[in-house]
Amino acid sequence: VNIIVFDTETIGLEKCFCYDIGYIVVNVESKNVLAKNEFIIEQVWNNKQLFETAYYCDKKELYVSKMRGRKAKLVNWGYAITQVIKDIKNFNVEGIYAYNSNFDTKVIDFNAEWYKTRNFLDYAPIFDIWGYTSELITSELANDYVEFCEKNALISESGNIQNNADSWGKFFNGLEWNEEHTALSDTEIESKILLYCFENGLTPQTEYKVKKCIESNSKQEKELIIKHNDKEIVYKYTSKREYKKNGWKIELKI
């Protein structure tokens, strides 16, 4: 079974002009990468005023380096989409995957409509990797990941195991790893996450719903510093956030 994993970087959330799209075609059984590309979209890149509104516009030098090193290509939107469609057809891709696919679907639909091009999402069904990781964690098929998160304080504000690409990347690559937030780099970690889900019993081309992750059993040690009369009193405590009907209640143990 061949699948494609992709990611996009955009100017904003509403008028989501895409300036970076990356994708990987991979065989599920062998894990061999059959094709991969990263395209910088010239309609946005060459519009300096527009590109500078992007949240990650400070990565411009990184993109310049990628293009100089021929790791990314500056192309127009139509060329990028045509190439994705060619690879979907050439490799008989059976499923398209993205992390938080609702957003990436919105991006592809918006840009295809804006530029009046074909839409590669018309050529295979799309599935959400976030749904896969939710299923893996809540069905207790990823206990090693859960233990890693609890050990390293990768816990959400609501006290649940974190379930995002950055935390999964740290699980695979170490705590020093940080998500690059460029399309191909993020696609590489997201394809690794997806293959891990398959290895641990989840089925390709299946729609798993995104759901709340399990609550962490660990209580994180924190410090409360009280300053009075030029003196500091430091209390060390553990806390666990509990949801109550009237809002959040913080449980302190000193």
Features from the language model and the residues they span:
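Short, polar/flexible loop-turn hinges at active-site or ligand-entry regions and domain interfaces
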Residues: 67-73, 115-121, 175-179
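Ser/Thr-centric signal marking residues that sit
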Residues: 8-11, 129, 133
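Acidic, low-complexity, intrinsically disordered interaction modules
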Residues: 213-234, 238
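Acidic, Mg2+-coordinating catalytic module of metal-dependent nucleases/exonucleases
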Residues: 92-102, 106-107, 111-112, 149-217
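Conserved non-catalytic scaffold segment of RNase H-like nuclease domains
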Residues: 2-111
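Substrate-recognition/cap helix-loop segment adjacent to the acidic, metal-dependent catalytic center
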Residues: 103-127
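Active-site-proximal helix-loop-helix substrate-binding element of RNase H-like nuclease domains
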Residues: 43-68, 130-187
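A short, charged, amphipathic alpha-helix used as a generic interaction element across diverse proteins
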Residues: 236-254
